[in-house]
Curated annotation (Swiss-Prot):
PROSITE patterns: RIBOSOMAL_S11. This is Small ribosomal subunit protein uS11. It comes from the Bacteria. Belongs to the universal ribosomal protein uS11 family. GO terms for molecular function: rRNA binding; structural constituent of ribosome.
Amino acid sequence: MAKEPARVKRRERKNITSGVAHVNASFNNTMVTITDAQGNTISWSSAGLMGFKGSRKSTPYAAQMAAEDAGRKAAEHGVRTLEVNVSGPGSGRESALRALQAVGMTITTIRDVTPIPHNGCRPPKRRRV
């Protein structure tokens, strides 16, 4: 007996006008997640998802591509205005912001939410090149 083809659940279109973009720029990758005000994910993208591998993931261009992709996906759900929370020390922070504006999003606020230790864990040792 032949198997019945699996039904693929279609992604429903959410009508959300404003959202929050969480840009996590680490030393190795840049991840962009766009959520609604409650924190439910609308769309997300990362430099690795865009096909960059290794050290190319940490470039500003890779962050720009990831932010454009996440912004386009969010625009399909009706997102027009964004609050941006930027986290991390990576090189893709500013380019991700510019890419979100280039997609046509209106950025209302930019917040730096990088966690700063009050002398917590010992940092990794310095690189000797």
